[in-house]
Amino acid sequence: MEAEASGRNRFLFISNGHGEDAIAAAVAARLPDTVAVEAYPMIGSGNAYAGVCPIVGPRATLASEGWRNVKGSLRRDIATGGLATVPPALRFLRKVNGKYDRVVVVGDMVGVLACYFSGHRGLTYLDVYKTGAARLYSGPERWAIKQACKTVFCRADNLARTLEHIGVDARSAGNVMMDAIPYGDYDARTRRSRALAVTLLPGSRALTSESFALQVDALRSLPAEMRPDVFLAVAGSVSVDELARKTGLKRTPMLSVEPSDLGELSDGDLTIHMARGGAMGNLLATSDLVLSQAGTATVQALGLGKPAITFVNPRDRRSRFTDEQMLFGEARTVVTADAPAIGAALRKLLSDDEERRRLGNIGRQRIGGPGAMHAIIDALMG
């Protein structure tokens, strides 16, 4: 095998989404130098791997960007040529079968199934999709996992138990999302001037600018004396110019030398401090709550004890949204997709310190803490 001939262990990370890329990159970055790592982001640019490891495999884009929380996303992907992305992915995976000492799948069953159908076995699977609060693994999912995977890391004990019962080495060692919160070179605290702060997490996909505009309208509805400091985590695939255009805000020049600083958006009344998504942890550390339409980032914010306000878009796939809410509970406040409703939820939380603390504690308890990263690295290097 090529991996054996090189004298150096070769690992391939396969991920299928922005949040999944970030988690996989965080794991890869913690591996020792004795491991040569490559990454195959199945969807999107894979920007999260920049500076961590080389990217391999065909690039693919989908209308949904892999986001299955929106109704009809699969139909739209198929209608816009999404099926055409499957053959190149399977060809690549067949071509590299046997060339890596370890293949690590991060995400949902898409990566596992792609590997199964291309002949890969003995996978390490980091399931960051299923929460254990609603649906467990289906019969076909359990069968595919047993065939293709050697070790599975689950987010919940009940998920791991369902796999253990069929002979799979399944573990629940903590929430790897909490180990993978990104921190960068950005001093959010020195930008604070008000009593409270809010971080905006509008997401990383097609609806980002639309979501951001609603969040900004809600902030504008607040009385001046209640306005918090506002921070925005900008995912790598998001256009700041589009965010500015959608909201009527103007981008100010970047004044600091911090690599993660993206300047400000302002209209003279409302100012939003922007940082790269790679510094999201910095923003959350100094914030009291979040307005979030994101996936992975919402989980991470709740796990840090930051209550979230999320609005339901008419296009959201309600089954997935409901499954998530069973896990998040009261820690995530859900409102309709209009600025007055979002603004009312904001006013309530900004004016009630005790309620924020209560919801923050619920989030920490529901999401669970870090710890999975150490177990994952041990398993990969064992």
Model-derived features: where do they sit?
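Nucleotide-activated sugar donor-binding and catalytic core shared by glycosyltransferases
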Residues: 1-382
